[in-house]
Amino acid sequence: MKLVFLIGSQREGSLNKLLAKEIEKEFADYDIVEYYPNDFKIFNQDLEHPEEAWIKKIREDIREAEGVIIASPEYNYSVPGTVKNMVDWLSRPNDEEKYLIGGKNFAVVGVTQGLDGTRLAQKELIAVLHQLRANIDASNFMAVPFADTEGKFIADNKKRIKDFADKFKKFIEK
């Protein structure tokens, strides 16, 4: 089985990357593929056709995956443009299929040092994914507030991470 992580931060020491890596441990029996904002060009319809090798590879991995987890930061109470750019690329039809996201199993997670733990960004992402006809269990999200930069928040949230992963496994294996 295969799982794709779209990790919405390139930053060294990214809290969302750290959270994604911890969630990945709960999927030890899965093939894990990660993509980051720098794996995507800035979306431009002029670049859609003919489809370039880099986006073909990403689309192929997502097509083969049982599920996709987006680990997104929240900037200024919203989804970062880099994360939206990833979704925009994946939402576009290509020559082979109309919609890649429609019918695909998705989950959204995030961590921040602030009060809401990326809840507003997650709400926006979930709304976009719903409009794109993704299968998403909106009740299974993970928003971690007040995270420390040393990663102690991981130890403090081990049970939540396991519970999230277990619930997503059930969702994608149904």
Task: Report the location of each language-model feature.
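A general structural signal for well-ordered alpha-helical segments in protein cores
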Residues: 16, 20, 55, 83, ...
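Helix-loop-strand module that forms the ligand-binding subsite of alpha/beta enzymes
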Residues: 50-132
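N-terminal beta1-alpha1 ligand-phosphate binding loop
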Residues: 1-29
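Glycine-rich phosphate/pyrophosphate-binding loop and the adjoining helix
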Residues: 4, 135-174
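N-terminal beta-loop-helix "entrance" segment that forms/cooperates
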Residues: 36-54, 149-151
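Short beta-strand elements in bilobed, periplasmic/extracellular small-molecule ligand-binding domains
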Residues: 30-38, 42, 135-144
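Short hydrophobic segments within beta-strands
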Residues: 6-8, 35, 109
